[in-house]
């Protein structure tokens, strides 16, 4: 065995119990294990950074979903970027930067027959930085791209509203809608986030939901109604937009972060009859359904980053896997500003 590899220790975070409400320290178990030499056809990767996403809260729950729950005792699922440190696969060389699903751990190995299924793929740092590969060029960007373009189907001149506008998915959706010739209205929490999406990202307007004036803001900024609503939050904000739909509107259901830590029943829409009155459509989307088209979206979005039509903002937390529990909860308390990333190592 490689003597350098044999000296490495893999620090991990495992799911110890299923949260009720906001995850606590009791829901996590810190563990470590030696790093093993990769087998025939396998690739060993050092994790450099992890993508922290609202969807992770749903993965901790039991029950039917679009992806199996994380098992108790299993390393917590997470996307990330890393660098290959050992390879017995001709498709990957030592030093290659890759994206994939490492989980919350410092090293991960992918068997040769699992590489495609795992999503392990080389990334080109000429197209974007490591953190941009977790943001606009990663799962959030793919979610925003296919959710808006395939489900929302925006047309030039239409009004697009996106909640969670300063977050990872929201910033991609809003900028892409602007590039496609739409009027863009964001909904975000706090004056600083609203100012940023208007001043830096080019949104036409942004409504601060913390001001309690979402309905009034929609009336002011969407006088002809909402043609496309990209929903990342659910709850009262979804209901407010439902009451302001234009005829033939499309609602993209991407997430409901306002509801993820409820200890009771999830709040459903009250104004759903607006769908009937306005001949509107509300459709859920899961980004993994579009995996075979990721290269198309990455090429387009990378072009926008290069020519300056699109910007990205990442909120990078340091501290390695030990910082994971606290960092994850930043998503659910509104403390992150931009795409939340947990840095594990330089590289």
List the predicted regions and their residue ranges.
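NAD(P)H dinucleotide-binding glycine-rich loop of Rossmann-like/cofactor-binding domains
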Residues: 76-83, 93-164, 310
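Glycine-rich phosphate-binding loop and adjacent beta-alpha segment
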Residues: 236-310, 343-347
